[in-house]
């Protein structure tokens, strides 16, 4: 079985690298053959040079840390609020009937529309950015947790109840562990949205992270720099996504064993 998994593992690593290489080649050919202005679309080498220059500045790493910290703090806050509410919705049908019709509508609200309201309520700075990140991750985690809890095999819960499990014991030792893959799936998507929320929040509500850098570069028509910041944000979101995905895979494996 391990031998059969090796080609699949190699393909998992190679496929995105090959895809990225094709994307970069197409990008370079577009800038070379069309003669498009550099301020509209810089070539990949110009972006790479700009990226190396930015990464040599200590300020860039501080800005990355600020945005990453806001995203992680917001995701943690959203998770702490979403999990108890999700369990309450799962347990009490009346609460589910009251809340669930509004979940779809609230998920449709764009972050850029929520940010000005947070400024009025909380003011400028890091706090409203973290709150915005929390709102971005709250609904995916809430919905995925409710779905995961509702799809637990009822026979397992009945067997646990026969052994005396009830209340907090049932939740801690049966329901939440069995729903962990779904919870982590929501958390995985939530982290990516949290990075988006941090950037949007910084652009609208101020701050000292990558969102402010992106705003300054837009004002200076520094397109190569904007591409670099976008690439850094993508890498940050990907790293967080992969970390939670690995945890999710390990949980799934543990449950199947």
Task: Label the predicted regions.
Residues 1-19, 242-257:
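Transmembrane alpha-helical segments of polytopic membrane transport and secretion proteins
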Residues 93, 150, 181, 185, ...:
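C-terminal transmembrane helix and the adjacent membrane-cytosol boundary/short C-terminal tail
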Residues 131-135, 168-201:
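Transmembrane alpha-helices
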Residues 73-103:
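Transmembrane-helix boundary motif in ABC transporter permease subunits
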Residues 149-155, 159-179, 219:
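Short helix-to-coil transition segments within interhelical loops
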Residues 104-140, 147-148:
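Generic hydrophobic transmembrane alpha-helix motif, especially the helices
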Residues 119-121, 196-233, 254-257:
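Glycine-rich helix-loop "coupling/hinge" segments at transmembrane-helix boundaries
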Residues 3-4, 33-76:
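Periplasmic/extracellular loop-to-transmembrane helix junction in inner-membrane transport proteins
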